[in-house]
Each structure stands twice: as structure tokens, then as C-alpha cells.
């Protein structure tokens, strides 16, 4: 396969601004999907979910976290991250998203593989993640590396904004 993209870690004061457009695209897609599924105009009318979503970016950039992007030429076409959790052995994978125009090229798998390797290097022994129930392709990707369904976990983003019932929770030992 001819790979025309690369995975790189972001850090520093400008990292959040670099990924903000892709994070915005991902959040807008999720919220639009929920609104359509529920027949609602908005599922986040007061912006609670949006504020929580963007506040997490600093946890990806802090100690024990990681923020990766996939670039095709100079365009960021994918993103993935992990953050530390309530215990020192567990990381939570977050914000795995590949733009529709770049899907099917192996970017999501490359991002996930790098996140898992980096989490191991940080000393984590397991990763957890939450994904919306409608994201069946994501479920298949995570299950292909051995992730298994678990009960909802404390501190989950979806649980904190009332979407636990529309979320699949997964865990993978490293």
C-alpha cells in the first residue's frame, strides 16, 4: 500500500489550536447524528457537552497524555488521543476521528496502534474508551485489537452529560 499520510504527536502551546477544527468537525457530526436519531433540534442546547468536550484537550497534552494527528500532505485528516484516568495504570482513548475523505486508508488503525504503543510506553497496563453506539465501524476497529465491552465507568464523558445509555464502553489490557 502506498501511504501518503503520516502520524505525528502534537505538543506545546499551539497544539490545541491545531486540532480544534477537527475536534469541532467531530463534535458537530456526533451532535447532528444524535439530534437526527432523537428527532430533536439540539441535544446540547446549553452547550454543556461542548464545554466539557473542549476542556479535555489539555488532559491529552499534559503528563501521561498524548495527542496524535494524521497528516496527508499538510492537511490534518485524523486525530486520536489518550489521557490519564483515576488510576495510574489506566489510560482512556479519546477523540478517534478520521475525516470521511480519508477513511478506508488505514489511518484509524495506524492512530490506534500508535496510541496503544505510546500508552504502553507511558506505563499503562490497560486502556478504556467510550464510543457512541451508532459508531459500528469504530466498534469493529477496537474489537479487532482485543477490546471487550465493559460496564459504564466512573468519569466517562458520555455519562457526565447524560448520554451513557447511547454509549458503548470498552477496555483493552495492554
Role assignments for model-derived ranges:
Residues 2-6, 125, 132-174:
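C-terminal "cap" of GNAT-fold acetyltransferases
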Residues 75-77, 90, 99-113, 120-122, ...:
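Conserved glycine-rich acetyl-CoA-binding loop
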